Design a protein with these regions (language model features):
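Conserved ATP-binding/catalytic motifs of P-loop helicase motor domains
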Residues: 1-748
Length: 748
């Protein structure tokens, strides 16, 4: 059965015509879910039992995946084309890619004997054990009130799920998620009624209709908007409210003395940033420095001046306690290198209730990689700073990767007028060839021109390209100074496997278990629909009532959607019952255990913080130096060496030959090898700029399509702000306020 989305528009003369397909592609996913929701609701009322298919589509319960695939030759053709052409599947492909695959694999239809065809199908169905599926007892229609209750709950979940990572969300995606969550019970009409309720109450704020039809409208939550307002209010109210540490002359003299003693040379921009830290009278100020501009070098004399400025000028107001906070451990290391010994991750500082109580008016909090800090975390930090009368310096690059969580707070504060010094002169590539220096500069605002400065190999087949990336890595003289950056985990794994095979490391080491985490939001992890038999759950904290310990893994044995419980089979054989809606979603992960081998000489990368080894943190790289006995000995690039016990508990370690670009922010290497697939959703202006500027000297780039690559690196992938939605509210036009029947009519 298919749902058909017709491109028919009636003009003012009463004639019908086809319009541009852009808006149809934009709403294709929503239209498909409207169809699925209506179909599921009616099938459920007729008594048919349903279950989600491979791609989330409704399937009749009792029909196996093998039986479905037997009669899905066309779908298999498209799946095979997507895999061979772009290395993707129907779930990860865009509507445009699926359309292209459908067109390029389509054959002209031939006239057929329908009676004979049906007879053949029945015979084949019997051969594979496919019996007719009969409906069970008819289900009475849910009352309108009950359907609205379900729709309210589903929409609430959709809002929590989407606003966890984006402050403003495409309206169609929000509705689609709500329909998916309530599938079989509600339809689009129910969701529209609830949308009217939440917009009328102000819980959800909706952007003006885009009459040009170029994109979907955005919506945001009142909570996200209020959070942004509080952040902006903190910054604005803190202007001209603190005593400068030094006057301009004292700052110049102190910086000169420290530079001379330490043998440092700051350029004009770095010096201006350091001077601002010492002379500002604002509680909050920022330093926006491009990748590799020497932000750590700039911080060193400024931090020394804050802490010990009185040693250089008796008249200064120095003697400050400086705390360093970063969203990643790489940022924490950079802060310590800058002289801030008291540095830790922002998340651990916020989780420590005692940490904020010892702040005073003579405390400076330096938040590094501020562009990776979510609005929620920044607001929490600002509350502590505000209460203590302390001050904060936000350091980052608003053009690099943004926080996975919602809210580009650092960029928002700059737009609102926060005092900010910009550091733009790149230092990381100062000894690189001219074409590399030029490519790095151009990648900031003209990425398509940066491509012209690079030597790029075009290899269309994904597996062949991954093999070429591996071969390039093997040519490197110093593995410690080589980064292979990919956009997907599939590419990362393939490169790692290829390198290990070439180095003859396979089958020569010890196997251990690691946990591959799925991509679930906290809201999803609290939802029973996210669980299915075969998944595995890793617990990040102990739950006494359930009887599970930190680090334990349980396999999902069964899911009871009626009472909302998940039954787990633990490693020791005991059964544990978990009720996801009663958990926070923060302290457990849904994923799968996998076995990984480490051999003598393997390069590794730490992927979490569960090892609890002094000085070893997420993102650190090293080499396996011994695999004898029950331990794997690792020598880290930092010089530390530890033996790690191999057991049943998953270890957060992976092969370290290739990694995704997002995990490499803050790193630098002599040689950077880039995988740039033009069709990848992870390739955009931000990722290209961030990944390219990891290099100190050389860049080796690979793509599937050189012609399309220029368009891919120009794609904008910016986080949205709730304020952007509020600004457009004045001329809002809501479709559900018009009398119309949106629910599709299906004859069953």
């Amino acid at each position: 059965m298919h749902g058909v989305f017709l491109n028919i528009t009636r003009n003012s003369d009463g004639d019908y015509q086809a319009m541009t397909n852009d808006r149809m592609f934009e709403y294709q996913r929503l239209a498909q879910e409207v169809y699925h929701a209506g179909l599921s609701a009616r099938l459920a009322r007729l008594g048919y039992a349903l279950e989600p298919g491979m791609y989330g589509e409704p399937q009749l319960k009792g029909i196996t995946r093998e039986q479905i695939e037997y009669f899905s030759g066309r779908a298999a053709q498209i799946e095979d084309f997507l895999q061979k052409k772009w290395g993707i599947n129907r779930k990860t492909a865009t509507p445009e890619q699926k359309q292209a695959a459908w067109e390029m694999t389509r054959k002209a239809k031939k006239a057929r004997d329908l009676d004979g065809l049906q007879a053949r199908w029945r015979e084949e169905a019997r051969e594979i054990g496919l019996n007719e599926v009969f409906p069970g007892k008819k289900v009475n229609d849910l009352s309108p009130e009950k359907r609205l209750d379900i729709a309210r709950d589903s929409l609430k979940f959709a809002i929590e799920h989407h606003t966890e990572r984006e402050s403003a969300v495409k309206e169609g995606e929000l509705i689609r998620t709500a329909l998916q969550d309530g599938r079989g019970k509600i339809t689009i009409g129910d969701i529209y009624k609830v949308m009217k309720e939440v917009t009328s109450s102000g819980e959800l704020i909706r952007q003006v209709d885009d009459l040009a039809g170029s994109r979907q409208n955005l919506v945001t939550s009142r909570e996200a908007l209020e959070r942004e307002k509080r952040i902006l209010s903190f910054e604005k109210s803190g202007r001209n409210k603190v005593e400068p540490v030094m006057n301009p002359l004292q700052a110049e003299n102190t910086l000169n003395a420290i530079q001379e003693r330490e043998g440092l040379t700051l350029n004009a921009e770095q010096r201006a940033a350091a001077r601002m830290i010492l002379t500002t009278d604002n509680r909050y100020s920022g330093i926006n420095g491009y990748a590799g501009t020497g932000k750590t070098t700039m911080l060193k004399p400024a931090i020394e001046s804050l802490q010990n400025g009185a040693a250089f000028s008796a008249l200064t107001n120095a003697g400050y306690r400086v705390i360093g906070l970063g969203p990643q451990h790489s940022a924490v290391h950079a802060l310590k290198d800058a002289g801030i010994i008291e540095s830790r991750t922002l998340q651990s500082w916020l989780a420590d209730r005692r940490a904020g109580k010892d702040l005073t008016g003579k405390t400076v909090v330096v938040i590094d990689e501020a562009g990776l800090t979510s609005a929620r975390d920044l607001e929490s930090a600002m509350k502590r700073i505000e209460k203590a009368g302390a001050r904060a310096i936000l350091v980052g690059d608003s053009k690099q990767y943004e926080s996975v969580a919602a809210g580009p707070a650092f960029a928002m504060l700059q737009k609102a007028g926060m005092e900010t010094v910009y550091v733009t002169e790149m230092q990381r590539q100062r000894n690189a060839p001219e074409h590399i220096r030029e490519a790095a500069r151009l990648s900031i605002d003209s990425p398509e021109k940066a491509l012209e400065k690079l030597s790029i190999r075009e290899i269309r087949d994904p597996q062949e390209r991954f093999k070429a990336l591996s071969e390039e890595y093997l040519k490197s003289q110093d593995p410690k100074e080589t980064l292979v950056l990919t956009g997907t985990h599939e590419a990362r794994k393939s490169v790692n496997e290829n390198v290990r095979e070439a180095l003859n490391l396979k089958g020569k080491g010890r196997e251990f278990i690691r946990f591959e985490t799925g991509d679930f939001t906290e809201a999803q992890k609290k939802r029973i629909n996210s669980y299915e038999p075969g998944q595995e759950i890793l617990f990040g904290k102990a739950y006494r009532l359930m009887g599970v310990k930190v680090g334990e893994v349980g396999k999902v044995a069964s899911v009871d959607k009626e009472d909302g419980t998940v039954r787990l089979k633990m490693e020791d054989g005991r059964n544990v019952t978990m009720t996801p809606r009663k958990l926070s979603g923060k302290d457990h992960e849904i994923g799968q255990r996998e076995t990984i081998e480490l051999s003598l000489g393997d390069r590794i990368r730490i992927t979490g913080n569960s090892l609890r080894l002094d000085g070893v943190t997420n993102g650190m790289r090293g080499e396996v130096v011994d695999v004898s006995g029950s331990r794997i000995m690792i020598r880290f690039d930092s010089g530390l060496e530890y033996g790690i016990l191999v057991g049943k508990t998953p270890l957060e370690i992976d092969h370290g030959y290739a990694q995704t670009g997002h995990s490499a922010q803050g790193l630098g290497a002599q040689t950077v090898i880039l995988d740039l697939p033009s069709n990848s959703q992870t390739l955009n202006r931000r990722s290209f700029y961030t990944n390219l500027t990891r290099t100190k000297n050389q860049v080796k780039a690979f793509t599937d399509d050189r012609e399309k690559l220029a368009g891919a690196v120009k794609r904008e992938k910016d986080k949205t702000m709730a304020h952007d939605v509020e600004k457009a509210q004045a001329v809002e036009r809501k479709p559900w306020e018009k009398a119309r029947k949106i629910e599709p009519e299906l004859e069953i």
